[in-house]
């Protein structure tokens, strides 16, 4: 069991950008964990045992997404990048019983880790899971025509080198007034560090892609944006035209 704030942080909040581990732990223990649905807690604990657990959405971000979806009365949503399904479950629990989520990931095996928990929570019927790259699916939807402006919310937590390619397509699929959420837009804090600063190899590899995305979103007149230091940074884009 963790014996100090730093080790606790590495266990339960590895994506927090807060400077104080104790403060992040306070947020989790005071506001997040006491209100976390039992199914989300179970999935979080199962995911923590997975060797790629760094890929999961943090508990505080899951709580934020769940609240956000309720506030905008979302019903038709999309998620690109699912992993074990923690953020997907947060979404499914927030949607009405007839709500729908188009969920895409290249690895169904990871999704199936969380699927029994999702089904036990009674929300599996809301999810249409597609295994494989998302870009061809998005292109097909755009070509079809009937999906234009139909999504209330889209959450992207996938390959950072394709975020701009996703945005080019999603902007036409989300409705006017709808939201797109891009995860990891502060990318371990590396976006504010010099290019030659020491950082992990995978962080360095995707850093420039994230920086370019942030610049592109800030310059896009079709959206209003809000970058939040939740989890590893999430940027909300509200389509206005």
UniProtKB/Swiss-Prot annotation:
Keyword Nucleotidyltransferase: no
Annotated substrate binding sites: 15, 157, 188
UniProt cross-references to PROSITE patterns, sorted A to Z: SAM_OMT_I
EC numbers: 2.1.1.104
Tissue: Roots and leaves.
Pathway this chain belongs to: Aromatic compound metabolism; phenylpropanoid biosynthesis
Required co-factors: a divalent metal cation
Binding residues annotated for S-adenosyl-L-methionine, in chain numbering: 57, 79, 81-82, 87, 105, 134, 159
Signal sequence, renumbered to the chain: none
Triggers of expression: By infection, plant wounding, or elicitor treatment of cell cultures.
Co-factor remark: Binds 1 divalent metal cation per subunit.
A biological process from GO: methylation
Keyword Cell membrane appears in the UniProt entry: no
Record field: transmembrane: none
Enzyme class: transferase
Gene3D superfamilies: Vaccinia Virus protein VP39
Catalytic activity as recorded in UniProt: (E)-caffeoyl-CoA + S-adenosyl-L-methionine = (E)-feruloyl-CoA + S-adenosyl-L-homocysteine + H(+)
Residues where a divalent metal cation binds: 157, 183-184
Sample GO molecular function, one term: metal ion binding
Alphabetic keyword roster: Lignin biosynthesis, Metal-binding, Methyltransferase, S-adenosyl-L-methionine, Transferase
Alphabetical list of Pfam families matching this protein: Methyltransf_3 (PF01596)
Family in the record: Belongs to the class I-like SAM-binding methyltransferase superfamily. Cation-dependent O-methyltransferase family. CCoAMT subfamily.
Assembly with partners or alone: Homodimer.
Protein function: Methylates caffeoyl-CoA to feruloyl-CoA and 5-hydroxyferuloyl-CoA to sinapoyl-CoA. Plays a role in the synthesis of feruloylated polysaccharides. Involved in the reinforcement of the plant cell wall. Also involved in the responding to wounding or pathogen challenge by the increased formation of cell wall-bound ferulic acid polymers.
Name this polypeptide is given: Caffeoyl-CoA O-methyltransferase
Organism expressing this protein natively: Petroselinum crispum
């Amino acid at each position: 069991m963790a014996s100090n704030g730093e080790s606790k942080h590495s266990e339960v909040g590895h994506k927090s950008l807060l400077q104080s581990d104790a403060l992040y732990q306070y947020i989790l223990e005071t506001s997040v964990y006491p209100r976390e649905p039992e199914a989300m807690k179970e999935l979080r604990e199962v995911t923590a045992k997975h060797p790629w657990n760094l890929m999961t959405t943090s508990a505080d971000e899951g709580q934020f997404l769940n609240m956000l979806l309720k506030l905008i009365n979302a019903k038709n949503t999309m998620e690109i990048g699912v992993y074990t399904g923690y953020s997907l479950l947060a979404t499914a629990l927030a949607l009405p019983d007839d709500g729908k989520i188009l969920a895409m990931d290249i690895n169904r095996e990871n999704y199936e880790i969380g699927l029994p928990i999702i089904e036990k929570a009674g929300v599996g019927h809301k999810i249409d899971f597609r295994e494989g790259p998302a870009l061809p699916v998005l292109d097909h939807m755009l070509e079809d025509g009937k999906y234009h402006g139909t999504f209330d919310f889209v959450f992207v937590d996938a390959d950072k080198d394709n975020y701009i390619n996703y945005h080019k397509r999603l902007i036409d699929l989300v409705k006017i007034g709808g939201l797109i959420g891009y995860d990891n837009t502060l990318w371990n804090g590396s976006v504010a560090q010099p290019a030659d600063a020491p950082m992990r190899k995978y962080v360095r590899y995707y850093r420039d892609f994230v920086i370019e995305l942030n610049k592109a979103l800030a310059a896009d007149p079709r959206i209003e944006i809000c970058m939040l230091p939740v989890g590893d940074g999430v940027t909300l884009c509200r389509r206005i035209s």
